[in-house]
Amino acid sequence: MIPIISIEGSTDIAFTENVQKRFEAFGFQTIDVADGNDLEAIGKAIEEAKADQTRPSLITVHTQIGYGCPAKQGKASAHGEPLGVENVAALRENLKWPLEESFAVPEEVFAYYAQYAA
């Protein structure tokens, strides 16, 4: 795993260390999840990590900065610039999020967390 985007832009001129290999050298179990939007793969990685009780685990999850926002996806500007109204609308549309509300929590998410609040 080598991070490729920072707040300043691409990291390839200043950072080339493979962090996952470093942790392997320390004796960690390392598990790689190629798609940070694949919740099933993340769940499997967690179960795999929990199954190995002999050593610590590092789960590397690859994500794309600004995912879903056409003007920011894969760009360093996703770190520190406001999206703006048009980009928020495009993001909501891409992620199939309600367009009418400025802030919304899906009922199933609210219900899940409500069970722990009591």
PLM-predicted stretches and their roles:
Residues 1-116:
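Glycine-rich ThDP/TPP pyrophosphate-binding loop and its adjacent helix/strand module
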